[in-house]
């Protein structure tokens, strides 16, 4: 093997070869391999980058996994689901999970002075990871999410802003649609615009605080106690009435610690509440099992004193009363439309999905993956792998043809040398090995040159973004590139093995050369 390698190197370094016909042919073959290898490197890098960018855009809108109620059948509207903090904690603890957040969606209508547009209103909370929205923010800022005050702020797409002539800071009306007969308007201030490049997102999605959807949909119950003066002449009696909002309207009122029943109104003597620190509580339930809400009031007479009239009757008098209130915040925020789960890597999707199904998912919940939510996009991305395979096969075929032509010409030019080697006792295998090493050396130089050219072009594109695309057609405005070492090494190894194996057949020409005729060959 050492002798074959030595002779192969001398053949390629032969100074007399400068004037031989094989020199330009070998150079052409090497240039072809360089260009073909560069095309393969760029094809793999651009395809991987494109798949990564599109997956990131789709995942950013709804997460890798979504947990919803089993009643979910419309992606534009999420039924209520009880949010279990323990379940969210269990999800965060799973290997491969990067982030967990809640969300809700409702259909809506955006109205300005002269335009109207149907949208999907997406509610997000304080547990939001803002990275995705910040990355695609065009102008302004994100709405305040998760605050106790819940300001009426909205983030809309740049497409919607241009179409409806809306500017950051403008006030728009959003009609939230509960059902055909229940459409409620609400004013929102536009805080910013975004652009993802995904038509199904940019054309219809607006973002608000999830609390607006929780209360609008009346997923929970809100209890309240109405207190008023009596009209029966008893200054120490108060009229109380239970109020409730939300639920399924088949409401039940409980007044713990009292004999009161039903909504009321009821008359109450604060003295009767002394054992409860003067507090009167109301708990509201409904027949569908909605999480109940509790409200309470404490009645405190102002300047309470007792007087005795001329008949010796002792009774209390006071100058008005003070009502302290508490509770009644509602149980709406204990419901969400669903839970989104973001993973550390897309290739962990199947493993995490299996674990969530087995360990975390409740019987009344449904788990969907991003592939199931956007099957057409992922089918398209998988089709790109077929295109890559076609390009690689074509480039390898071109390399094989180039190298076969170059090797045959080198063999023909070295016919006399082949005859001499055989006359000196070299076997056909040893002579073939010389020319296979020549071919492998030329291939190696071409592959390394192609790697260098492809990587340089890819890095220039990554750093400068000089090749741009129409975002309406390709979802990205710049050709993305994702370079990793292992795909390049696989391309190199595969190309080298296939091409060298293909050179075995033309190298067999050596076996047909007779030493006596070869020595006389000119």
How would you label these PLM feature ranges?
Residues 1-37:
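N-terminal Sec/SRP start-transfer signal
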Residues 40-49, 385-423, 431-434, 506-507:
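A hydrophobic alpha-helix feature that marks transmembrane segments and, especially
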Residues 19-27, 345-400, 410-412:
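Peri-transmembrane interface segments
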Residues 408-410, 415-461:
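Transmembrane alpha-helical interface segments in multi-pass membrane proteins
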Residues 47, 51-85:
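Membrane-interface junction motifs in transport/secretion proteins
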Residues 80-233, 243-265, 273, 286-290, ...:
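A structural signal for hydrophobic secondary-structure junctions
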Residues 448-491, 504, 508-512:
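Short helix-loop junctions at transmembrane helix boundaries
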Residues 65, 160, 332-356:
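A short beta-strand structural signal in non-transmembrane regions
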């Amino acid at each position: 093997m050492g002798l074959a390698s030595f002779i192969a190197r001398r053949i390629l370094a032969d100074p007399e070869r400068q004037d031989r016909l094989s020199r330009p042919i070998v150079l052409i073959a090497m240039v072809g391999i360089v260009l073909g290898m560069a095309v393969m490197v760029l094809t793999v890098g651009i395809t991987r980058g494109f798949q990564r960018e599109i997956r990131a855009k789709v995942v950013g809108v709804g997460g890798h996994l979504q947990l919803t109620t089993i009643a979910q059948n419309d992606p534009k509207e999420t039924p209520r689901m009880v949010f279990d903090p323990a379940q969210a904690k269990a999800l965060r603890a799973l290997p491969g999970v990067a982030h967990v957040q809640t969300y809700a969606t409702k259909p809506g209508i955006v109205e300005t002075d002269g335009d109207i547009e149907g949208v999907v209103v997406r509610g997000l909370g304080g547990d939001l990871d803002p990275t995705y929205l910040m990355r695609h923010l065009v102008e302004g800022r994100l709405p305040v999410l998760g605050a106790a005050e819940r300001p009426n702020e909205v983030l809309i797409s740049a497409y919607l802003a241009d179409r409806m002539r809306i500017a950051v800071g403008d006030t728009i009306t959003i009609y939230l649609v509960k059902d055909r007969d229940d459409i409620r308007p609400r004013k929102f201030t536009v805080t910013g615009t975004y652009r993802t490049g995904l038509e199904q997102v940019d054309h219809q999605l607006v973002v608000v605080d999830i609390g607006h959807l929780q209360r609008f949909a009346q997923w929970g119950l809100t209890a309240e106690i109405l207190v008023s003066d009596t009209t029966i002449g008893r200054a120490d009696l108060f009229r109380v009435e239970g109020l409730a909002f939300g639920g399924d309207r088949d409401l039940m009122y409980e007044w713990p610690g009292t004999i009161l029943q039903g909504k009321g109104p009821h008359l109450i003597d604060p003295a009767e509440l002394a054992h409860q620190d003067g507090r009167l509580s109301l708990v509201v339930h409904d027949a569908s099992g909605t999480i109940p809400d509790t409200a309470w009031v404490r009645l405190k007479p102002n300047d309470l004193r007792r007087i005795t009239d001329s008949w010796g009757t002792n009774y209390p008098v006071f100058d008005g009363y003070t009502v302290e209130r508490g509770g009644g915040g509602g149980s709406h925020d204990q419901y969400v439309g669903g839970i989104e789960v973001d993973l550390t890597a897309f290739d962990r999707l199947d493993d995490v999905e299996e674990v969530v199904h087995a360990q975390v998912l409740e019987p009344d919940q449904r788990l969907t993956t991003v592939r199931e939510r956007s099957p057409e996009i992922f089918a398209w991305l998988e089709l790109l792998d077929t295109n890559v395979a076609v390009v690689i096969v074509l480039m390898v075929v071109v390399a094989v043809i180039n190298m076969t032509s170059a090797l045959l010409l080198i063999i023909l030019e070295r016919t006399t040398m082949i005859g001499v080697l055989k006359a000196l006792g070299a076997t056909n295998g040893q002579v073939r090995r010389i020319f296979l090493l020549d071919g492998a050396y030329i291939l190696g130089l071409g592959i390394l040159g192609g790697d260098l050219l492809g990587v340089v072009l890819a890095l220039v594109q990554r750093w400068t973004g000089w090749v741009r695309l129409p975002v309406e057609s390709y979802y990205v405005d710049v050709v993305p590139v994702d370079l990793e070492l292992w795909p390049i090494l696989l391309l190199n190894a595969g190309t080298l093995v296939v091409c060298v194996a293909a050179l075995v057949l033309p190298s067999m020409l050596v076996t047909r050369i007779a030493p006596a005729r070869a020595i006389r060959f000119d």
